[in-house]
Amino acid sequence: MNALTAVKANTDDLAQRHTGFTLAPSAQSPRLLALTFTADTTRQFLHQVAQWPVQALEYKSFLRFKIGKILDDLCGNQLQPLLIKTLLNRAQGALLISAEGIDDVAQAEEMVKLATAVAHLIGRSNYDAMSGQYYARFVVKNVDNSDSYLRQPHRVMELHNDGTYVEEVTDYVLMMKIDEQNMEGGNSLLLHLDDWEHLESFFTHPLARRVMRWAAPPSKNVSHDVWHPVFDVDQQGRPVMRYIDQFVQPKDFEEGVWLSELSDALETSQNILSVPVPVGKFLLINNLFWLHGRDRFTPHPDLRRELMRQRGYFAYAASHYQTHQ
């Protein structure tokens, strides 16, 4: 483990009696906390937000914050500060969130509402060019002919950060399981940057801070390239990453070889977490120091998984990129 942040469970938060939800370390790592809304909180939340269909949240962005306030009020106003504290805590920065009673694809709209409420307690979800909304829903099937690895089921989707090919700051990523049929495998893969064995050697390499070109395929609906280095630092000088192997465009032999070595070093890390995410649950991670990916699925002709993602910026004190410092 890197010396940057040793894992120290926040015993005060874990021992505290919370209103409307429970909190515990996940089975995979003390860095990843499991937060579960009680059945009563879930029922009251869905009742109070039933008047607004998801379309209303799409058209009136302030409603996303309103339903966040409803959820926080139901949790005795303990939820928002805990979410912010956890996600900004370098030693943690990740949550697996669920709500008792939300676990079926027939509740897809309710899932979007819940995830939206949580996300807008910490910041605001960015426009997603792939879907044209503040969130994107997409399906993984047994056969895929798309132009990126996002929907390809029979290979590992390598570890990466989101927001590498857009101008907007991407502080957080939310990934929710809406449906799953005939599925085996396909766990979410997570790696905390400070647990990566090779962080120091790559972060101190001369190419770590070189500005590189990033370009997305047509399905992303982004027509222009962006330029930034693989590594930056946060306000305390700690490493953060903006990296995805599919979209970085090395300009020469030196960059290409270094990027290939970086990819191999990430994928062979012994500290990658494999996290099952059942239907109705979602991961919420700090995108600056967590990388995420997906394990391969076992082939099945009727394989189907539907996911929903949101990604955006923290509206509170955050360690944004300090480019070229």
From Swiss-Prot:
GO molecular function, one term: oxidoreductase activity, acting on paired donors, with incorporation or reduction of molecular oxygen, with 2-oxoglutarate as one donor, and the other dehydrogenated
Top-level division of the source organism's lineage: Bacteria
Catalytic reaction(s) noted: glutarate + 2-oxoglutarate + O2 = (S)-2-hydroxyglutarate + succinate + CO2
GO biological process: one example: L-lysine catabolic process
Keyword Glycosyltransferase: no
Cofactor note: Binds 1 Fe(2+) ion per subunit.
Biochemical pathway: Amino-acid degradation
Cofactors (names): Fe(2+)
Enzyme Commission number, as recorded: 1.14.11.64
Keywords tagged on the record: Dioxygenase, Iron, Metal-binding, Oxidoreductase
Binding, Fe cation: H160, D162, H292
Biological function: Acts as an alpha-ketoglutarate-dependent dioxygenase catalyzing hydroxylation of glutarate (GA) to L-2-hydroxyglutarate (L2HG). Functions in a L-lysine degradation pathway that proceeds via cadaverine, glutarate and L-2-hydroxyglutarate.
Record text on subunit structure and interactions: Homotetramer.
Family that this chain belongs to: Belongs to the glutarate hydroxylase family.
Protein name, entry field: Glutarate 2-hydroxylase
Naturally occurring in which organism (per UniProt): Salmonella paratyphi B (strain ATCC BAA-1250 / SPB7)
